């Protein structure tokens, strides 16, 4: 069976520093890049890559095995350090790209995101947008639970993340981040 390659970065490229917002070495050192397989919206199997904290690698492998088994479509999985994105969260969301580690702050705050520690993943941002009362990202994205690739409370993807101790941004009260799952920080990170 032919596999379509969405990302084939080497670890050095996937973990290169963002010159605009350098990551402390002790955080960068804990990140691992893993290959993941999934059906994309073309109905074919693709191979991508996700960078996450070493403590959550097994969780992400388990989730992507489930994604593949259930044919939950993923647009792409490409690290944000890839030249297509240059660490830009807006660009990766516009592309509908699934991503993990991104040393950055939470939108419109000065607090570090769980992505900054590699303990969060965004899945299909175009189907699962970030929505506040003032705006949504990516632009013109709609949350429609009937669309393929949309995460729903109680579905198998949600249930697996929840069983592994991850929190879903779709449950937040002040905003909805349907694409976002995060594993709470531990003292070790």
Please identify what each model-predicted range represents:
Residues 24-28, 48-59, 111-115, 149-153:
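Extracytoplasmic/periplasmic, Sec-exported soluble proteins
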Residues 17-25, 86-90, 108-112, 153-155:
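Intrinsically disordered, low-complexity boundary segments flanking structured domains
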Residues 105-112, 117-189:
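Catalytic cores and adjacent binding grooves of peptidoglycan-active enzymes
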Residues 28-92:
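Active-site acidic/histidine clusters and adjacent loop/turn architecture
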Residues 26-31, 94-96, 114-116, 174:
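A generic structural signal for short, non-catalytic loop/turn and secondary-structure boundary residues
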Residues 33-36, 63, 67, 101, ...:
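Generic structural hydrophobic/aromatic packing signal, biased to beta-strands
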Residues 78-117, 128-130:
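Active-site-adjacent loop/helix surface patches within enzyme catalytic domains
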Residues 1-46:
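N-terminal module-boundary/linker segments of secreted carbohydrate-active enzymes
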């Amino acid at each position: 069976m032919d596999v379509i390659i969405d990302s084939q970065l080497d670890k050095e490229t996937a973990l290169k520093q963002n010159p605009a917002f350098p990551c402390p070495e002790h955080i960068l050192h804990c990140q691992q890049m893993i290959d993941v397989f999934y059906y994309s919206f073309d109905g074919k199997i693709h191979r991508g890559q996700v960078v996450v904290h070493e403590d959550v690698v097994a969780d992400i492998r388990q989730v992507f095995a489930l994604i593949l088994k259930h044919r939950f479509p993923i647009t792409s999985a490409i690290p944000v350090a890839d030249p297509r994105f240059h660490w830009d969260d807006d660009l990766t969301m516009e592309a509908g790209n699934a991503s993990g580690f991104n040393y950055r702050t939470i939108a419109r705050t000065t607090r570090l995101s769980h992505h900054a520690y590699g303990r969060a993943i965004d899945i299909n941002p175009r189907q699962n947008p970030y929505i506040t009362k003032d705006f949504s990202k990516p632009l013109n994205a709609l949350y429609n639970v009937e669309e393929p690739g949309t995460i729903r409370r109680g579905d198998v993807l949600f249930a697996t993340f929840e069983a592994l101790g991850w929190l879903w941004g779709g449950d937040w009260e002040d905003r909805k981040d349907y694409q976002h799952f995060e594993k709470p920080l531990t003292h070790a990170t």
